[in-house]
Amino acid sequence: MVTKKPVKKKVVPKQKVAPAPLAKPKKVEVKKVVNPLFEKRVKNYGIGQNVQPKRDLSRFVKWPKYIRIQRHRAILQKRLKIPPPINQFTQTLDKPTAQQVMKMLEKYRPENPIARVQRLKAKAEAKAAGKEEPPSKRANQLRQGINSVVKMVEQKKAQLVIIAHDVDPIELVVYLPALCRKMGVPYCIIKGKARLGTLVYRKTCTCVALTQVENADKPNLAKLVETIKTNFNDRFDDIRRHWGGGLLGPKSMARLAKLEKAKKREMLQKN
């Protein structure tokens, strides 16, 4: 018999597949060398044990008293039922209209303290020199302060009344919207007693009133008055019906939800 020679198979070398162009290369984990002499101990964060980890401790900060008071007031105004005469001060003039009003009031700011001193000094010097000046007409300026504004409203001389929303105590101005409506004077509630204070060179101001304006500003004032009347004077009946507050906190809401869930479970068990 003739023996066949075994055929040698060709060994084809394995080709490496090219990696994907956007594939991230695998990170090679480097094993940390641990010294066996050091024992691993679990940290105990109890009192007098390990140093505490860094946490956000702002909840436990003892804040200044004025900050605590304003936070308590904000929460109380949400929780308690607020009657409509006080709640109306939460509904302020919209931002674009408020900016237009402030722009108008800027033109009729009263004279600053330095200018007043200089004017009175010049007047006194003229009087000492024997020069008598005729009495000058009062300039078209803002009327400031609650007494002056109320007087202007009662005499129906005020063309526009602007009230701050955050007067404290609120009793100073709580009756003013009703008085303005009764006398037919347009009024609006604007954000910030400090904002009104800047107009009259004071820290804060409860309210200001416009009595007279220049002829050039009369068309702009008429447009503003029309918008303000629509938002405040004409909506007075609607405003005086709306109570404020009465909102529960997250803890109370969670407690009520838990009770409702328990009631539903009991009803299902009975059925």
Swiss-Prot record:
GO molecular function: RNA binding
CC per GO annotation: cytosolic large ribosomal subunit
Source organism, top-level taxon: Eukaryota
Ribosomal protein is among the record's keywords: yes
Keyword presence, Ribosomal protein: yes
A GO biological-process term: maturation of LSU-rRNA
Pfam families per record: Ribosomal_L7Ae
Stored InterPro entries: eL8/uL1-like, Ribosomal_eL30-like_sf, Ribosomal_eL8-like_CS, Ribosomal_eL8/eL30/eS12/Gad45, Ribosomal_eL8/Nhp2, Ribosomal_eL8_euk
Keywords, ordered alphabetically: Ribonucleoprotein, Ribosomal protein
Assigned protein family: Belongs to the eukaryotic ribosomal protein eL8 family.
The protein, known as: Large ribosomal subunit protein eL8
Species annotation: Anopheles gambiae
Gene: RpL7A
